[in-house]
Amino acid sequence: MIYFDNAASTAVHPEVVKEMIPYFDTQYGNPSSIHQFGRKAKNAIEKARKQVAALIGAEPNEILFTSGGTESNNTILYGIPKSQGPKFVLNHIITSSIEHDAILEPCRDLEKNGVKVTYLAVDEHGHVNPDDIINSINPQTVIVSIMFANNEVGTIQPIKEISEICKKYQIPLHTDAVQAVGKVPINV
């Protein structure tokens, strides 16, 4: 059998397994502890944080580790609107109609609780028109969430242009870049 869905899930590279085995076997200390095992674990995490930061053009202190893409997406999509307190139901989110379910499901759930969500249409190539983002922004818009790369159709969104729009309007931009990291250059 040949597996063609490595963008969604893939085997761990043998070199990575080799590097990780000590942390599953002999160096399993709590990184928050001050003992030797804890310090070694903390050093390994900080090394990984620096490597991830370098990969995406970030600072190490900007990197937060989660269990995966879905948890990261949920943290942002639920966190930003709910950070507004009881007024969170007045919030507005802009996303695209072709997002991964890890984005669409939280948006649908937030809609059930009163949050307004605009689902932008895409063109025949799967691209979001940045002008549609501008036209959808309103005073209640708290976040724009557009995937960087679509793993089903291969579309790369104009994230740089979308980022500039979000900066201009002072609206946080969230991009699920799981499908893009390691395949196209990323500089946050």
Regions found by a protein language model. Name each.
Residues M1-V188:
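Pyridoxal 5′-phosphate
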